[in-house]
């Protein structure tokens, strides 16, 4: 059995190609069914995200499969093979195992060490389970990859340092305040950065969030997801005093939160400290706000400094993580190779049992028909011996006649014979 991983990702293909090779959640089951109709494909998993589309397969053999699988992808997505061939990568066995472990651990991600990919890999695995498309080898590989990703998170610092603006803003808030769960947080805007920040805060059990946006309708979708309250931009002036933390990211050409607005909020708060994180360009918060006592204002440049420092730390952690992947992929390949022996042993035992049953049935028939018992037993054991040693005898003769001493000694070892 051979394991394969093939696909395209953000490193090998532009978004204009990646978007044409994606599988939507409702088509993955159908695609797997279609893929497993190939006589050599015994199991499959389809991983499709905005940054990658990959097939993980267990196959009987890989001869001529490269062209056939690319052809299948192109036919399924109505692409010209020339468009795909220059962007596709192809990994076998140990390389395929290492690749999946790196993907699941975030080592192959656009943002090094990002945790979301593990959830996406688990979802792809679950879809394959649901479609009954998993082979035992693939099931073992994916389960092992999940444990490797967990080990890497536990033993390295790969995921402990924020490397996106949204995560850096949330990390900064957690560093300044001992606990976020009871704080009031105001998010200004409803774009991608604020969406990421809101989800990240929700994961850290923040229960009191307000989302201020120019249009309530867009903000309401996000608010429903993270259980937040929606307010309009003009309402910020009235509600700002409630906020312990403000994270702002809009496309406004002018500041939304001015020094006077913050001063009024501080007065109502009786000068309780406020953290304001402005990740908008142009800035949403007037820079003079920084001059106020009990106000901590951070700009996108401040966060970029944190991100660069954290990215360097992640890269150092990635070296350690790669060593773990190499070690675990070797362990997995040892197991996979041992499965070949297990299957061979099982097949050999079944063959021997079939011979024994046939010989025993013949002997019993002869005895029931009046044959001498001792003679029947001797004949049974003689015939059984001849049938069992027939194949090894031919192999020994062939190795000897070919002068293949290495094979001859290997056969003698396997038969428990001493070397000459």
Curated annotation (Swiss-Prot):
Please name the CDD domains in this protein's record. NAD_bind_Glutamyl_tRNA_reduct (cd05213)
Write down the InterPro entries for this protein, in alphabetical order: 4pyrrol_synth_GluRdtase (IPR000343), 4pyrrol_synth_GluRdtase_dimer (IPR015896), 4pyrrol_synth_GluRdtase_N (IPR015895), GluRdtase_CS (IPR018214), GluRdtase_dimer_dom_sf (IPR036453), GluRdtase_N_sf (IPR036343), NAD(P)-bd_dom_sf (IPR036291), Shikm_DH/Glu-tRNA_Rdtase (IPR006151)
Q: Which reaction does it catalyse?
A: (S)-4-amino-5-oxopentanoate + tRNA(Glu) + NADP(+) = L-glutamyl-tRNA(Glu) + NADPH + H(+)
Q: EC number(s)?
A: 1.2.1.70
What GO terms in the biological process aspect are recorded for it?
Answer: protoporphyrinogen IX biosynthetic process from glutamate
Q: Which PROSITE patterns match?
A: GLUTR
Q: Name one GO molecular function term.
A: glutamyl-tRNA reductase activity
Q: Which chain positions carry the site (Important for activity)?
A: 99
Q: What class of enzyme is it?
A: oxidoreductase
- Residues that, per the record, bind NADP(+): 189-194
Give the active-site positions.
50 (nucleophile)
Q: Pfam families per the record?
A: GlutR_dimer (PF00745), GlutR_N (PF05201), Shikimate_DH (PF01488)
User: Where does the chain bind substrate?
Assistant: 49-52, 109, 114-116, 120
Q: Which UniProt keywords apply?
A: NADP, Oxidoreductase, Porphyrin biosynthesis
Domain of life from the UniProt record: Bacteria
Pathway(s): Porphyrin-containing compound metabolism; protoporphyrin-IX biosynthesis; 5-aminolevulinate from L-glutamyl-tRNA(Glu): step 1/2
Query: Which protein family is it in?
Result: Belongs to the glutamyl-tRNA reductase family.
Task: Give the free-text miscellaneous remark of the entry.
Answer: During catalysis, the active site Cys acts as a nucleophile attacking the alpha-carbonyl group of tRNA-bound glutamate with the formation of a thioester intermediate between enzyme and glutamate, and the concomitant release of tRNA(Glu). The thioester intermediate is finally reduced by direct hydride transfer from NADPH, to form the product GSA.
Instruction: Tell me the domain comment.
Output: Possesses an unusual extended V-shaped dimeric structure with each monomer consisting of three distinct domains arranged along a curved 'spinal' alpha-helix. The N-terminal catalytic domain specifically recognizes the glutamate moiety of the substrate. The second domain is the NADPH-binding domain, and the third C-terminal domain is responsible for dimerization.
What does this chain do?
Catalyzes the NADPH-dependent reduction of glutamyl-tRNA(Glu) to glutamate 1-semialdehyde (GSA).
Subunit-level organization: Homodimer.
Its protein name is Glutamyl-tRNA reductase
Give the source species: Photorhabdus laumondii subsp. laumondii (strain DSM 15139 / CIP 105565 / TT01) (Photorhabdus luminescens subsp. laumondii)
């Amino acid at each position: 059995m051979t394991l394969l991983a093939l696909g395209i990702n953000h490193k090998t293909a532009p978004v204009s190609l990646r978007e044409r090779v994606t599988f939507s959640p409702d088509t993955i089951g159908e695609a797997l069914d279609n893929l497993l109709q190939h006589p050599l494909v015994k199991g499959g998993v389809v991983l499709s995200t905005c940054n990658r589309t990959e097939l993980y397969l267990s196959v009987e053999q890989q001869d001529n499969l490269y062209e056939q699988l690319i052809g299948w992808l192109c036919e399924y997505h109505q692409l010209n093979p020339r468009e795909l061939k220059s962007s596709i990568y192809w990994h076998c066995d140990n390389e395929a195992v290492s690749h999946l472990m790196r993907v699941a651990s975030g080592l192959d991600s656009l943002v090094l060490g990002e945790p979301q990919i593990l959830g996406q890999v688990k979802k792809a695995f679950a879809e394959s389970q649901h479609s009954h498309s998993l082979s035992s080898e693939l099931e073992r590989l994916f389960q092992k990859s999940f444990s490797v990703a967990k080990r890497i998170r536990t033993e390295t610092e790969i995921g402990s340092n924020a490397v996106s603006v949204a995560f850096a803003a949330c990390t900064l808030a957690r560093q300044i305040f001992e606990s976020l769960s009871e704080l009031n947080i105001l998010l200004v805007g409803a774009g991608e950065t604020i969406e990421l920040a809101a989800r990240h805060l929700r994961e850290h059990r923040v229960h009191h969030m307000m989302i201020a946006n120019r249009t309530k309708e867009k903000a309401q979708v996000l608010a429903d997801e993270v259980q937040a309250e929606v307010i309009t931009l003009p309402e910020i002036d009235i509600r700002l005093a409630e906020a312990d933390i403000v994270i702002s990211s809009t496309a406004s050409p002018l500041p939304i939160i001015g020094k006077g607005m913050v001063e009024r909020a501080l007065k109502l708060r009786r000068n309780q400290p406020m953290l304001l994180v402005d990740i908008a360009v142009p800035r949403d918060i007037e820079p003079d706000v920084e001059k106020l006592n009990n106000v901590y204002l951070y700009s996108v440049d401040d966060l970029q400094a944190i991100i660069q420092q954290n990215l360097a730390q992640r890269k150092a952690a990635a070296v350690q993580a790669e060593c773990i992947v190499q070690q675990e992929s070797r362990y997995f390949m040892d197991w996979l190779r041992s499965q070949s022996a297990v299957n061979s042993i099982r097949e050999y035992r079944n063959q021997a049992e079939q011979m024994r049953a046939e010989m025993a049935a013949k002997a019993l028939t002869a005895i029931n028909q009046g044959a001498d018992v001792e003679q029947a037993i001797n004949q049974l054991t003689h015939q059984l011996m001849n049938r069992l040693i027939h194949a090894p005898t031919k192999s020994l003769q062939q190795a000897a006649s070919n002068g293949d001493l290495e094979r001859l000694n290997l056969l003698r070892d396997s038969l428990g014979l001493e070397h000459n």
